[in-house]
Structures are given as C-alpha cells and as structure tokens.
Regions:
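Class I SAM-dependent methyltransferase SAM/SAH-binding core
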Residues: 1-35
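C-terminal alpha-helical "lid/dimerization" subdomain adjacent to the S-adenosyl-L-methionine
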Residues: 3, 75-136, 141
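Glycine-rich phosphate-binding loop signature in dinucleotide/nucleotide-binding domains
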Residues: 37-40
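Conserved acidic residues
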Residues: 43
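A conserved beta-strand element that flanks and buttresses the S-adenosyl-L-methionine
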Residues: 46
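Short catalytic micro-motifs in class I SAM-dependent methyltransferases
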Residues: 49-50
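A short glycine-rich, Lys/Arg-flanked "PGG" loop and its adjoining helix->strand segment in the class I
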Residues: 58-73
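C-terminal lobe and adjacent flexible extensions of AdoMet/dcAdoMet transferase-like proteins
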Residues: 140-148
Length: 148
C-alpha cells in the first residue's frame, strides 16, 4: 500500500503500478499529519525521500510503529542535514535534512529497537549558480519488538 497525502503523488504512483502491471500494490490517500491512522498491519514500512516534507516526524514514527506487526521493520531513506540547497523551491519542505543521531533517538522513542543508520546514496545535483553540490542520503532501519 502506497500512502500519501498528495493526490498528485499518488497519481504518479498509480501510473507506475499500471506500467509495471503490479497486481499486489495499491495506493491510499491519507493525511497522517491530520490524525488519520495508517491501516495495517504491515510487515514493512518504507519511506524514501519524503520525511523532510513532514512537519512532525515523531508523531509519524508512532503511527508507523502502531501499523507494524510484531517484528515488523521500518526503513527510512532521507537527506542528511544540509543547508537548504537541495530544494530550489522550499515550499512544503519542513526540514533541511536530518541529523542521523537525533533521528535514531526519535525512532527509539517511538518504540523501535535495533535502530541502525548508514549512508545509502549520494546525490549530485546542480544548485543555482554554485554548480554541482553533493548531498548524502542515509538509510535508517528499526524493528518493532515481538512483545509490543
């Protein structure tokens, strides 16, 4: 299930589902920030390059934890802290990346264990008149304990 509060993003995802003839993937328009609960239960929650567009990530991580089955995994890829250059138009961007150590603590506070972080990728992109700039993307994973 692909969940987003943006109908436009879900339309793009729906097109990709059709292009690849995926039969076991669906989309769901849901605004978790407005208090809507994720359906679930899920074995895995994945977020890729979206959390810097979420105001309160701590609340979202609690939603992720609640939606997971015991032993379920959360995998999050997003920007490391940066100086605001990644988005040329910052509309809808609430974080200029994240400090990994702080992000790990927020996941642990939401109830996740075995939280680890690593560098997943580097993005080189042109930044206005500054030329190419390097941005790193982290991957943080955590597990919902069996007892929870």
């Amino acid at each position: 299930t692909g969940v987003d509060s943006s109908r436009g993003m879900l339309d793009i995802f729906d097109r990709k589902i059709m292009e690849h003839t995926l039969k076991n993937v669906k989309t769901l328009h849901l605004d978790v920030e407005a208090g809507a609960a994720l359906p679930g239960p899920y074995h895995l929650v994945v977020s890729s390059m979206t959390l810097h567009h979420i105001r309160d990530t701590a609340v979202l991580f609690h939603h992720f934890h609640e939606a997971l089955l015991p032993s379920g995994l959360v995998c999050i890829a997003d920007l490391d802290s940066e100086n605001g250059l990644f988005h040329s138009d910052p509309t809808g961007t609430f974080h200029n990346g994240f400090d990994r150590a702080e992000f790990q603590r927020v996941l642990e506070n939401a109830g996740f264990s075995h939280v680890t972080a690593s560098t997943a990728a580097e993005i080189i992109k042109p930044v206005d008149r500054l030329g190419d700039h390097r941005f790193t993307v982290f991957l943080i994973t955590g597990r919902k304990d069996v007892s929870k």
